[in-house]
C-alpha cells in the first residue's frame, strides 16, 4: 500500500515548519511548496524552507515564483513604499502586513500541486493569533476553501484542507514543535530583515513571546530581543 501524501505550504517560518513536522508525524509523505511572491525577506525564507525540507526528508520540494501579489501591492510585506509597523500585539485592526487574499492564492497553487501528485491533504500553518488580524486565516475561510476544492477538482479527487493550529496560540505551536524536534534555527519570521531579525515587528514579537512563555531561547539572531511576557 502506498504511503499517504500531503502538500505543506512552506513559508520558511516556524508555523509552517511545525505543520510539516505534524504532517510527517501523522504518517504523510510531505511535499513542500514554497512561494516567492515579492515579500521583503523572500531569499531568507526560501533558504529556510529548503533547509527544512532537507531536515524532514521531504518527498519533494517545489519553489514557485510569482510577482502578481507584489504588483497588486497594498501590503507592507511587498510594497517598498509601505513601512513595516512596529509590533502592536493588542490591536484588533487588520495590520499593514496583510497581503490581500494571499492564502487563497497560495492554497490554490497547493491544491494544483496536490492533485497533480495524488496527495490527499494540504497543510497550512495558520493559527488563532493570525486570524485575529488576517481575514484569510479564519476557520470560516478554510471551510469555504474546502468546498471550493471539492467543487473544482476531478470527481475522484479528495483533498482535505488542514489547518491544524487554527485554534492554537503561537506558544502552543512552539511547544509542539520543540516536542517534534523542529529545527527552529532554520526558520524565519521577521517581516523587515533577512539577518538579523529585527525583534520588533509583529512577527518577531509573537515569535519571541512564544519562546519566552516556554522559558526557551529562540535560536535565531535578533538585532533586538525585547521581553514580550
UniProtKB/Swiss-Prot annotation:
Catalyzed reactions: 7-carboxy-7-deazaguanine + NH4(+) + ATP = 7-cyano-7-deazaguanine + ADP + phosphate + H2O + H(+)
Q: Does the keyword Nucleotide-binding apply?
A: yes
* Top-level taxonomic group: Archaea
Query: Which GO molecular function entries does the Swiss-Prot or TrEMBL record give?
Result: ATP binding; ligase activity, forming carbon-nitrogen bonds; zinc ion binding
The cofactors named for this UniProt entry are:
Zn(2+)
Supply the alphabetized keyword list: ATP-binding, Ligase, Metal-binding, Nucleotide-binding, Plasmid, Zinc
Its biological function? Answer: Catalyzes the ATP-dependent conversion of 7-carboxy-7-deazaguanine (CDG) to 7-cyano-7-deazaguanine (preQ(0)).
What family is reported? Belongs to the QueC family.
Protein's UniProt name? 7-cyano-7-deazaguanine synthase
Q: Which organism does this sequence originate in?
A: Halobacterium salinarum (strain ATCC 700922 / JCM 11081 / NRC-1)
The record's gene field reads: queC
Amino acid at each position: 500500500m502506498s504511503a499517504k501524501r500531503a502538500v505543506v505550504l512552506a513559508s520558511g517560518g516556524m508555523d509552517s515548519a511545525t505543520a510539516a513536522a505534524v504532517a510527517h508525524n501523522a504518517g504523510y509523505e510531505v511535499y513542500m511548496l514554497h512561494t516567492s511572491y515579492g515579500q521583503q525577506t523572500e531569499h531568507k525564507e526560501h533558504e529556510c524552507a529548503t533547509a527544512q525540507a532537507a531536515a524532514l526528508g521531504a518527498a519533494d520540494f517545489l519553489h514557485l515564483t510569482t510577482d502578481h501579489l507584489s504588483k497588486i501591492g497594498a501590503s507592507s510585506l511587498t510594497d517598498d513604499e509601505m513601512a513595516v509597523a512596529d509590533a502592536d500585539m493588542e490591536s484588533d485592526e487588520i495590520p499593514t502586513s496583510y497581503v490581500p487574499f494571499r492564502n487563497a492564492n497560495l492554497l490554490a497553487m497547493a491544491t494544483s500541486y496536490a492533485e497533480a501528485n495524488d496527495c490527499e491533504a494540504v497543510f497550512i500553518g495558520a493559527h488563532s493569533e493570525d486570524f485575529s488580524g488576517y481575514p484569510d486565516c479564519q476557520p470560516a475561510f478554510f471551510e469555504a476553501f474546502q468546498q471550493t476544492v471539492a467543487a473544482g477538482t476531478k470527481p475522484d479527487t479528495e483533498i482535505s484542507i488542514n489547518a491544524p493550529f487554527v485554534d492554537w496560540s503561537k506558544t502552543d505551536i512552539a511547544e509542539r514543535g520543540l516536542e517534534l524536534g523542529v529545527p527552529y534555527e532554520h526558520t524565519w519570521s521577521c517581516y523587515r530583515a533577512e539577518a538579523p531579525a529585527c525583534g520588533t515587528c509583529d512577527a518577531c514579537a509573537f515569535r519571541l513571546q512564544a519562546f519566552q512563555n516556554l522559558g526557551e531561547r529562540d535560536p535565531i539572531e535578533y538585532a533586538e530581543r525585547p521581553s514580550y511576557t
